[in-house]
């Protein structure tokens, strides 16, 4: 409360702090408290075997705060936003392979469920000639083809 008048709202918060369960959970609470509308929280060391508490705290935090969603995971980071901004960030992450590909950085975006609108996406490196999209093991070369497959599965 003492900080509230002095601390500006954050559009982007990257958490890479003390890696205990309580420390991570507290950092998430603090980041959300000062997050500007439309802001993004990025939590480091997700699924890192040396920092398992980060992943545990993340999933508990998401369970306890239903208006916060994980929109994407990749490179040991989780990307969180408020539910009302989920569509905005999903659109951004869907375009990530094309945006980064133009710069010579190749990533594969993976849909982790057939229910496109309810799932977070994950991403990781891939080769320039490899498919840049995937739905539970099935790979696709274009976003249009991927979304078409998801539409037919619904």
Model-derived regions, located:
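Active-site segment flanking the S-adenosylmethionine/decSAM binding pocket
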Residues: 1-51
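Rossmann-like AdoMet/SAM-dependent catalytic core
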Residues: 52-154
């Amino acid at each position: 409360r003492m900080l509230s008048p002095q601390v500006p709202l954050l559009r982007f918060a990257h958490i890479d702090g003390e890696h205990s369960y309580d420390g991570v959970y507290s950092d998430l609470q603090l980041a959300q408290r000062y997050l500007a509308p439309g802001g993004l929280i990025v939590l480091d060391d997700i699924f890192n075997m040396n920092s398992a508490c980060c992943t545990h705290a993340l999933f508990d935090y998401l369970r306890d705060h239903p208006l916060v969603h994980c929109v994407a995971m990749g490179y040991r980071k989780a990307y969180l936003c408020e539910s009302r901004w989920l569509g905005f960030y999903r659109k951004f992450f869907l375009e990530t392979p094309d945006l980064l590909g133009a710069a010579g950085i190749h990533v594969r975006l993976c849909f982790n469920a057939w229910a496109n609108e309810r799932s977070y996406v994950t991403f990781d490196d891939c080769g320039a000639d490899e498919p840049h999209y995937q739905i539970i093991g099935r790979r696709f070369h274009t976003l249009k083809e991927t979304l078409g497959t998801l539409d037919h599965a619904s």
